[in-house]
């Protein structure tokens, strides 16, 4: 592996990242980034968190939920996937919003364009705190009325892969997908 790296025998991919800015009472309380996902989650197990999502300054929905996942295509096969989100191919530039265990009729994942500005606000007068996590790192607590804004970062992450296998092959291997269906090769011609 080291020899291949030294010989530059690898494939380089630029992966989209997210810029995450949290504010409360008009002042910035956190600025960071994420390669996979940023999440806003409830701090206390016994309560739901009331969150409002806005896209480009327009309200989308308010949910009583355990939180939301905001993911890149790289993160679409991680926490966002486990929460019910779709797989997004890594060469697609998009931002994915996935509510976590939302109590609402409209609680479906939403795929946004890469230049969208996504905001998530902890509804004022809500009991309890939200917590922002970036790629599994606890970033900041969000009191009621605080919000995060998430946009595509101008700085991608460059990844070196030793395999030039197409994403489909890597996806099948990662999730051990059955490419022959649940009945195996039962549909092949048996003549």
Model-derived features: positions:
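ATP/nucleoside-binding phosphotransfer catalytic cores, i.e., glycine-rich phosphate-binding loops
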Residues: 40, 56-59, 107-191
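Glycine-rich beta-alpha junction loops
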Residues: 22-24, 42-44, 72-76, 101-102, ...
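A generic structural signal for short beta-strands and their flanking turns/coil linkers
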Residues: 14-18, 34-36, 47-51, 66-68, ...
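Catalytic core of DAGKc-family lipid kinases
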Residues: 1-66
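Gly/Ser/Thr-rich active-site loops/lids in small-molecule metabolic enzymes
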Residues: 62-106
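Short Pro/Gly-enriched beta-strand edge/turn motifs at strand-loop
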Residues: 33-35, 100-103, 129-133
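Short beta-strand-to-turn element immediately C-terminal to the catalytic PLP-Schiff-base lysine
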Residues: 23, 40-41, 54-56, 71, ...
